[in-house]
């Protein structure tokens, strides 16, 4: 039986537990400036609801009760001018959630509308009180220096779902991801950090449910403190998640979470209400002068993180994941929203300062996706110096150089050298450019060299969704080469492999922090779908059965060599002292060389001992080398070395070193 113990405390937010006079006390606290009354709703094992009125201190409602134990479900009922106490409201600080709403039809959605006066307690998601006990043993973060970091972006389910080396019951789970087979694979590859697509509790949007689809990526969050349970092989997702993190740490691999603080799953104003909208709509969401939601995320709403409560919610959440789950870093989705305080972007926004000053976040890696779709939303290079940033200019300029005839060699060199035009300011170092060719959002590397057009028909939006400009090239045939006869089939496949190799080596040997999309190292495909957010199936799951061993070995060897090159692991901007840019005859690049639109080949000397031969032309290229004795290292499948000359017989990237 649940009983009021006393008025409780306004801090901390959410629930907290302590023992007083040999009695287990649970304190609940909820912010709502708009409410005129709040009821705490507790559910016993027979699903019987107990409603207890909460006490207000300024804008926080709180209450301490007895009788709460692990597994107890709770929610709130909000009273006020714009509230509806007939609807259960989820705690924004919920550490676990029981139930996902059915939004597949107009009728099912109507139960969650504030305008609907039916009680939805039997349908609404509820927070769950959980045990956070866990034996971390002597777990410590690998704390890999930024200059030595190689990020590997993956999806928890998709990584192991089709891997027959993993026990069937564990595939697609936290336990499956941390299976010794996977850890050994990642160690062999050489990556130092995994960046997990969202593992916070999320739900499927109404339009996807109506089509029988799911939000596979997970960028539709409902409870940012809660571990997503559908990736758990056990009935204790939090403990299983912690076990996974501990296993990664033992393997020397950091765990970075992709987090979504820019919007919530509540979408547009007329859509179902689950949490923040029902608590204090005016505080939690940005609105325009007409009172409508500002939708600069493309997801129906934009969270207001300039308010005290919004900033506190974010910092409290980050602290929870670090302290409870030993997380090593965060990648912030549509991170421009974090700096919107007017709501224009401000690189000195208070939230950035709060994050910087939070003690638990001092050694944590912070990565921004530095854009949204709003006013002045594109902010690449403008985040505080303690953030790294996804560099889409790197992606686009390298793809144009390798795959398009119009790609400029000067743009390639600028990106390859660390994008100093974007990041060399405010005492920032090269690691702050997080370089990538592909990510979850867009083509895979294999598809980038296999498709001229996106093929998103299975998403149900008549191929309207996804980026239209991918800077891709199919090398003569769209998609599969099965319809081709020899020798054309082999020619197309070889050219695609050469292009993938060139892009991979460019990524892994560029100045800055490289990020590799899971599966690119062995030629994974999504069959041309460049927006597979709703495909929880064979389209997105890694296809281990089609493993390209040659590509994997190249990737592994390139990563290993990167770790030997001082100019790439000292986090320093390149200068004439450690880099030389040479043309194909071995002479310093001239202004004319850089500006020549036909120039698609060059040589780069790093640290006066590593020679990179780069040829982005479809045909072969002869290079006159600097007068040294050079020894081939990697990318040598199409190189002939004789005296002071080297010939790449086709498109390619070759590394040599001074014997």
Curated annotation (Swiss-Prot):
PANTHER family: GLYCOGEN DEBRANCHING ENZYME. Belongs to the glycosyl hydrolase 13 family. It comes from the Bacteria. Its EC number is 3.2.1.-. It comes from Haemophilus influenzae (strain ATCC 51907 / DSM 11121 / KW20 / Rd). GO terms for molecular function: glycogen debranching enzyme activity; hydrolase activity, hydrolyzing O-glycosyl compounds. Residues 456-468 have a biased composition (Basic and acidic residues). Keywords: Glycogen biosynthesis, Glycosidase, Hydrolase. Pfam families: Alpha-amylase, CBM_48, GlgX_C. Residues 456-486 are annotated as: Disordered. This is Glycogen operon protein GlgX homolog. It is an enzyme of class 3 (hydrolase). The active site is at 333 (nucleophile), 369 (proton donor). InterPro entries: GlgX_C, GlgX_Isoamylase_N_E_set, Glyco_hydro_13_cat_dom, Glyco_hydro_13_N, Glyco_hydro_b, Glycogen_debranch_GlgX, Glycoside_hydrolase_SF, Ig-like_fold. GO terms for biological process: glycogen biosynthetic process; glycogen catabolic process. The record marks 441 as: Transition state stabilizer.
């Amino acid at each position: 039986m649940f009983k009021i113990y006393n008025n409780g405390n306004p801090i901390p937010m959410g629930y907290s537990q302590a023992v007083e006079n040999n009695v287990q006390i649970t304190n609940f606290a909820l912010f709502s400036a708009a409410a005129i009354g709040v009821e705490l709703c507790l559910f016993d094992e027979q699903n019987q609801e107990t409603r207890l009125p909460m006490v207000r201190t300024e804008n926080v409602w709180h209450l301490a009760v007895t009788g709460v134990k692990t597994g107890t479900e709770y929610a709130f009922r909000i009273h006020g001018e714009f509230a509806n106490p007939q609807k259960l409201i989820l705690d924004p600080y919920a550490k676990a959630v029981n139930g996902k709403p059915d939004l597949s039809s107009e009728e099912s959605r109507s139960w969650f509308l504030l305008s609907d006066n039916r009680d939805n307690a039997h349908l609404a998601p509820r927070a769950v009180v959980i045990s956070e006990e866990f034996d971390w043993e002597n777990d410590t973060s690998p704390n890999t220096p930024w200059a030595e970091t190689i990020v590997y972006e993956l999806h928890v389910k998709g990584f192991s779902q089709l891997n027959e080396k993993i026990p069937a019951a564990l595939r697609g789970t936290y336990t499956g991801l941390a299976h010794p087979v996977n850890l050994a694979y990642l160690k062999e590859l050489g990556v130092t950090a995994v960046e997990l697509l969202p593992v916070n509790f999320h739900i499927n949007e109404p339009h996807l449910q109506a089509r029988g689809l799911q939000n596979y990526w997970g960028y539709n969050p409902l409870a940012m403190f809660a571990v997503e349970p559908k990736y758990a092989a056990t009935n204790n997702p939090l403990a299983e998640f912690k076990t996974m993190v501990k296993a990664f740490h033992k393997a020397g691999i950091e765990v970075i979470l992709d987090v979504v603080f820019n919007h919530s799953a509540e979408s547009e104003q007329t859509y179902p209400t689950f949490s923040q909208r029902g608590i204090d709509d005016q505080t939690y969401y940005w609105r325009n002068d007409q009172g409508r939601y500002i939708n600069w995320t493309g997801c129906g709403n934009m969270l207001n993180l300039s308010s005290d409560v919004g900033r506190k919610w974010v910092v409290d959440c980050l602290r929870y994941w670090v302290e409870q789950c030993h997380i090593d870093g965060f990648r912030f989705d549509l991170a421009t929203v974090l700096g919107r305080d007017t709501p224009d972007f401000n690189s000195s926004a208070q939230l950035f300062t709060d994050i910087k000053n939070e003690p638990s976040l001092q050694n944590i890696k912070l990565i921004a996706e530095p854009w949204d779709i709003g006013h002045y939303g594109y902010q690449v290079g403008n985040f505080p110096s303690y953030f790294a940033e996804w560099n889409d200019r790197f992606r686009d300029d390298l793809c144009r150089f390798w795959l398009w005839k119009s790609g400029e060699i000067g743009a390639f060199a600028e990106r390859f050298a660390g994008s100093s035009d974007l990041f060399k300011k405010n005492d920032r170092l090269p690691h702050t450019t997080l370089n990538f060719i592909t990510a979850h959002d867009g083509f895979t590397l294999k598809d980038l060299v296999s498709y001229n057009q996106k093929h998103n028909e299975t998403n149900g939006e008549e191929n309207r969704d996804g980026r239209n400009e991918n800077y891709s090239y199919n090398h003569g045939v769209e998609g599969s080469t099965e319809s081709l006869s020899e020798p054309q089939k082999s020619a197309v496949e070889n050219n695609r492999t050469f292009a993938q190799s060139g892009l991979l080596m460019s990524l892994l040997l560029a100045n800055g922090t490289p990020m590799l999309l899971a599966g690119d190292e062995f030629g994974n495909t999504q069959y041309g779908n460049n927006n597979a957010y709703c495909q929880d199936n064979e389209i997105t799951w890694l296809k281990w059965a089609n493993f390209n061993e040659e590509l994997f070995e190249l990737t592994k060897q390139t990563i290993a060599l990167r770790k030997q090159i001082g100019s790439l692991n000292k986090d320093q901007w390149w200068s004439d002292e450690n880099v030389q840019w040479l043309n194909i005859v071995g002479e310093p690049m001239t202004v004319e060389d850089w500006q020549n639109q036909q120039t698609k080949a060059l040589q780069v000397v790093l640290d006066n001992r590593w020679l990179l031969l780069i040829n982005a032309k479809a045909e072969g290229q002869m290079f006159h080398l600097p007068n040294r004795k050079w020894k081939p290292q990697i990318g040598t499948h199409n190189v002939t070395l004789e005296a002071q000359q080297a010939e790449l017989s086709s498109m390619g990237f070759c590394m040599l070193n001074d014997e």
